[in-house]
From Swiss-Prot:
Cytoplasmic side: 60-88
Region span, Disordered: 66-88
Biological source species: Sus scrofa
Main localization (coarse): membrane
A biological-process GO annotation: sodium ion transport
Protein name per Swiss-Prot or TrEMBL: FXYD domain-containing ion transport regulator 3
Cited PROSITE patterns: FXYD
Membrane topology per record: Single-pass type I membrane protein
Cell compartment(s), UniProt: Cell membrane
Length: 88
């Protein structure tokens, strides 16, 4: 019984492969122009990347490294002072 079922499945798979559309059929709704899609994706990704690099290098966006940080770990007051902890 397994041999018959396996042969029927192989036959059905083979028949569907014989009836498949030509991959170069440009009238098919499942035909995609992969080259144009790739070029369009590179343009859509490269434009914001180049724009970001231009903005960073233009000097309009200045990072202020000379300022002192607002919070230094050495200046923080201690959270637990002697006598403030209670035994419950």
């Amino acid at each position: 019984m397994h041999e018959v079922a396996l042969s029927v499945l192989i036959l059905l798979a083979g028949l569907s492969a014989l009836d498949a559309n030509d991959p170069e059929d440009k009238n098919s709704p499942f035909y995609y122009d992969w080259h144009s899609l790739r070029v369009g994706g590179l343009i859509c990704a490269g434009t914001p990347c180049a724009l970001g690099i231009i903005i960073l290098l233009s000097g309009k966006c200045k990072c202020k490294f000379s300022q002192k940080p607002s919070h230094r770990p050495g200046d923080a007051p201690p959270l637990i002072t002697p006598g403030s902890a209670h035994d419950c």
